[in-house]
Structure formats: structure tokens, C-alpha cells
């Protein structure tokens, strides 16, 4: 239990930051799923458009250090490979 005023404030901030970061991670998962769904549907043009939007989302979340930059690179690489295999 936080005893000092500073510790109580940091605990409040941590709860708020955790909620925001969880939301951002959910956005990431949704973006990745959208690309995978478009690839499974076999629509290359739609998949390419969704892929570009997804890459933007992944990079933005990595820049905010919500996920590690290597994890972001791994996601982008695997999605790009799946998109390329569709051709």
C-alpha cells in the first residue's frame, strides 16, 4: 500500500497509464487481425491497403514504447511476408 502522497499519486497514474496502454495494445491486435483477415480473403489490393494502415499503427505504438521496437519489426516482417506470399 502506498504510504506517501507521492506514492499514492504514482499508483493513480499507473492505473491510468495501464488502461491507456492496454487500449493501445488492443488496437495493435485489431490491426494485425484485419491484415490477416484480408490476406485470408485473398483480396490483394484490400490487404495491401490494410497492411499500410497496420504498419502505421504498429510504428506509432512502438514509438510510444508500448511494445518493443523489435516486436514491432517482427509483426511488420511477418505480415509483409504473408502479403507477399499472396501474390
From Swiss-Prot:
One of its GO terms (molecular function) is small ribosomal subunit rRNA binding. One of its GO terms (cellular component) is cytosol. It comes from the Bacteria. Keywords: Ribonucleoprotein, Ribosomal protein, RNA-binding, rRNA-binding. Residues 1-29 are annotated as: Disordered. InterPro entries: Ribosomal_bS20 (IPR002583), Ribosomal_bS20_sf (IPR036510). Residues 20-29 have a biased composition (Polar residues). Pfam families: Ribosomal_S20p. The keyword Phosphoprotein does not apply. One of its GO terms (biological process) is translation. Belongs to the bacterial ribosomal protein bS20 family. PANTHER family: 30S RIBOSOMAL PROTEIN S20 (PTHR33398), SMALL RIBOSOMAL SUBUNIT PROTEIN BS20C (PTHR33398:SF1). Binds directly to 16S ribosomal RNA. This is Small ribosomal subunit protein bS20. It comes from Herminiimonas arsenicoxydans. The lineage of its organism: Bacteria, Pseudomonadati, Pseudomonadota, Betaproteobacteria, Burkholderiales.
Amino acid at each position: 500500500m502506498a504510504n506517501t502522497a507521492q506514492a499514492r499519486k504514482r499508483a493513480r497514474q499507473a492505473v491510468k497509464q495501464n488502461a491507456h496502454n492496454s487500449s493501445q495494445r488492443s488496437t495493435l491486435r485489431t490491426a494485425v487481425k484485419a491484415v490477416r483477415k484480408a490476406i485470408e480473403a485473398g483480396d490483394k489490393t484490400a490487404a495491401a491497403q490494410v497492411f499500410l494502415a497496420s504498419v502505421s499503427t504498429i510504428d506509432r505504438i512502438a514509438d510510444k514504447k508500448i511494445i518493443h521496437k523489435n516486436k514491432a519489426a517482427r509483426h511488420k516482417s511477418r505480415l509483409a511476408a504473408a502479403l507477399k506470399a499472396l501474390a
